[in-house]
Amino acid sequence: MINHITDNQFKLVSKYQPSGDQPQAIEQLVDNIEGGEKAQILMGATGTGKTYTMSQVISKVNKPTLVIAHNKTLAGQLYGEFKEFFPENAVEYFVSYYDYYQPEAYVPSSDTYIEKDSSVNDEIDKLRHSATSALLERNDVIVVASVSCIYGLGSPKEYADSVVSLRPGLEISRDKLLNDLVDIQFERNDIDFQRGRFRVRGDVVEIFPASRDEHAFRVEFFGDEIDRIREVEALTGQVLGEVDHLAIFPATHFVTNDDHMEVAIAKIQAELEEQLAVFEKEGKLLEAQRLKQRTEYDIEMLREMGYTNGVENYSRHMDGRSEGEPPYTLLDFFPDDFLIMIDESHMTIGQIKGMYNGDRSRKEMLVNYGFRLPSALDNRPLRREEFESHVHQIVYVSATPGDYENEQTETVIEQIIRPTGLLDPEVEVRPTMGQIDDLLGEINARVEKNERTFITTLTKKMAEDLTDYFKEMGIKVKYMHSDIKTLERTEIIRDLRLGVFDVLVGINLLREGIDVPEVSLVAILDADKEGFLRNERGLIQTIGRAARNSEGHVIMYADTVTQSMQRAIDETARRRKIQMAYNEEHGIVPQTIKKEIRDLIAVTKAVAKEEDKEVDINSLNKQERKELVKKLEKQMQEAVEVLDFELAAQIRDMMLEVKALD
């Protein structure tokens, strides 16, 4: 049984008060939500404090909230901001837990089968479990997610029904508890104690929940009765306190009980027989043999272990769904009356709409060639209309809402005034003749004032050539391309802010979510080449990159002024006029945003210093090793707090290496 607390209130903590046009935006959004309006748009210019407005709305309507961003970087930024605004509430993070993911696929032209290959990030997996367990235990929950939240996740009912509920005085034998833990995919390991594992020492069972990373629980028995339950530090065993109730959630989201498993296996076998008959009738003997061998192996694993690699491909049978019925997703873990906020909706909605088709075409190939049963097609993302059916109330948040959002609602709430008084930048158009030398002069002027420059090009070659040329001219410049990993991208942005280099060149990486107040110049090359990157919305987003600096200026290099350029220039001028009038009326002088540079790499340097010392861990005594483990654990937590999970995993491995010597 789960103790679900429903009377928690969101408590917003901030040293700021709503200002500019934030108060009216907050009031309108809240009134519309409380009035039952299903959809509305918050059209907030860059730098107007949309996240703060979202936080104010969440605290006032007091509903569990799902915030969807279109990539992990943005989700990470939002997660950090919401954690600061709501330190006493459950702010959770739910993104794909793969560091690396190669989906299962088959290429008929070369008869190549590509087996699923992936590397799961343990820290993100922990955060996903933390999100689902929080949703079932309390109502004051904000989950910041990427679009992976519309992928199949397993039945929330099975997940909740499988919870092992413990309290002092409960009559249950130690062996029964051990069996219950194994049933929900916990693993016994008396030596390497990690998330999703338990260990046994006489009448004491220690359990490490899948949603925790440092605290475990010690269940002490007296005969066949639980005597007491203590929360302990997993690493040191130090007792932190006693608890009167403990809910242990499954170690995997794909979980089912024995009765349902037998029914599911029977359905899998029946489907296998049907599909084998189809293949044999069509003379596809190789495909039939392939399917029979693979499926029978999976069935055996499900019978013996309750789990198999690729178990999600059988989720339709395990969940008891009909063919074509949508899968369970994170959205099903929310109560009926919840709020969805879609950040940068002009980008995120496109992803939600496109996920299903890409997944379907790949899976059909696997089914047609005997690598998977047809039911694997129902392990999929939601279709757009299925996502819409989950929507109770939704707020689309964007500086440039797309056509879809505008079709869903006519309620558009503008947020144009920046609390800092900053204006939208001035935009000018210059000819392409001599543009590179002209731009070089502008960059040098910014470098002298310790300001930064963004340059956006249309092609990779242009970006590379431009970067090489500016380097030859003595400019400190970097090119950010699409192959750069998320963590490296974050480091590049930080180095730009610190002045390690002055100019960043990119193609489609500079439009939203990159927050660099030091940038005073944005140069848009080939601004008159109509297309996805040079349409009205794309240009407005790019212009917005210079809106966090009081000296913000945008130069479009073009030989003609396209309709998209003109509309973007006109909209920027309209906003600038409103902002100037507000500043004049209230005596506000625009100030460049002073934003703390979060030291994402501080922990890396700390570890590097430790490594530089070349400590021979074999030469350390037990007390010194214990102190080193404590130091590493602290560094690991610091890495997790800034979402540097790759580094956290490296530190964890170092810790295990040290602990293995004891």
Curated annotation (Swiss-Prot):
Residues 31-188 form the Helicase ATP-binding domain. One of its GO terms (cellular component) is cytoplasm. Its main location: cytoplasm. GO terms for biological process: nucleotide-excision repair; SOS response. Forms a heterotetramer with UvrA during the search for lesions. Interacts with UvrC in an incision complex. This is UvrABC system protein B. A motif (Beta-hairpin) lies at residues 97-120. ATP binds at residues 44-51. It comes from Streptococcus pneumoniae (strain CGSP14). The lineage of its organism: Bacteria, Bacillati, Bacillota, Bacilli, Lactobacillales. The gene is uvrB. Residues 626-661 form the UVR domain. Belongs to the UvrB family. Pfam families: Helicase_C, ResIII, UVR, UvrB, UvrB_inter. It is found in: Cytoplasm. Coiled coil: none annotated. The UvrABC repair system catalyzes the recognition and processing of DNA lesions. A damage recognition complex composed of 2 UvrA and 2 UvrB subunits scans DNA for abnormalities. Upon binding of the UvrA(2)B(2) complex to a putative damaged site, the DNA wraps around one UvrB monomer. DNA wrap is dependent on ATP binding by UvrB and probably causes local melting of the DNA helix, facilitating insertion of UvrB beta-hairpin between the DNA strands. Then UvrB probes one DNA strand for the presence of a lesion. Residues 435-601 form the Helicase C-terminal domain.
